[in-house]
Design a protein with these regions (language model features):
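Solvent-exposed, non-transmembrane alpha-helical starts
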Residues: 127-131
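Zn-dependent metallopeptidase/amidohydrolase metal-coordination segment
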Residues: 112, 180-231
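His/Asp/Glu-rich mid-to-C-terminal helical/loop segments that flank catalytic regions of hydrolases
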Residues: 43-45, 61, 65-90, 132-137, ...
Length: 241
């Protein structure tokens, strides 16, 4: 435990504010695979928004209700999900409907209500606003066609996080193999919290061969991990000198 270690656990106070924070993390994508580098340096974190889409229709019998008589919110949601995917692909952003709740959620019932949550991540806040606007407009157009109703609620929006540019440039340049690439991340990290607190912060990413994250397939090769650890140790040694 911490009590048995040389470090005594105690509250972190403003008097103990760190001068710099550097985080080492596996890349949660495949940019480093594409550029053939074992390590990359984070430039910042994309803006991130979560939005609730409520689609209201009319519950009815799945067998006796003719297709043309239905007001099916599941159909409106399905078209909205496809629209979100298409718009994100066209603009190089991220849009995911990863959670859906259906009422009454019966095999033999046309739903009366569908709630779906959109996770959207974009390079800038303006791009995030634009992506949401396009998806919402297309969803509304489909709702009018389906005889359903749409309500969109913003649940949370996180602005961009910029890591210390001077520190990132120094970490990227000062190593034996040349310059590590600077890459943005679309995921939240501890480093982002500390950067927003005004602490000079940097991130090092280790190549992920699969590019997969939040899955058992996420991993990094031991050789790349060693390169990442060496880069972190070298960075900390230079910062402490």
């Amino acid at each position: 435990t911490l009590f048995r270690s040389p470090c005594e656990p105690r509250p972190w106070t403003e008097a103990e504010r760190p001068a710099t924070f550097v985080e080492l993390h596996v890349e949660q994508g495949r940019h480093l695979v594409d550029v053939g580098q074992a390590v990359g340096v984070g430039s910042g974190i994309w803006p991130h928004g979560r939005f609730r889409f409520d689609f209201a229709g009319e519950a009815n019998h799945a067998g006796t209700t003719r297709m043309e008589d239905r007001r099916d919110p599941m159909l409106t949601y399905a078209v909205t999900s496809l629209a979100a995917n298409k718009q994100a692909r066209l603009s190089g952003q991220r849009a995911t409907f990863g959670r859906v709740e259906v009422t009454p959620n019966g095999t033999n019932a046309v739903p009366s209500h569908v709630t779906a949550w959109l996770d959207a991540r974009c390079e800038t806040e303006g791009t995030l606003d634009q992506l949401l606007s396009v998806i919402t407009r297309q969803a509304q157009e489909r709702a009018e066609r389906d005889g359903t109703r749409l309500t969109v609620t913003t649940e949370s929006v996180s602005g961009p996080v910029r890591f210390d540019a001077g520190l990132a440039a120094r970490v990227a340049a000062d190593h034996e193999g040349g310059a590590w690439p600077l890459i943005p991340t679309q995921a939240g990290h501890d480093a982002g919290i500390l950067a927003e607190a005004g602490i000079p912060t940097a991130m090092l990413f280790v190549r992920n061969p699969t590019g997969v994250s939040h899955s058992p397939e996420e991993h990094a090769e031991p050789a790349d991990c060693l390169v990442g650890v060496a880069a972190l140790a070298d960075t900390l040694e230079r910062l402490a000198s």
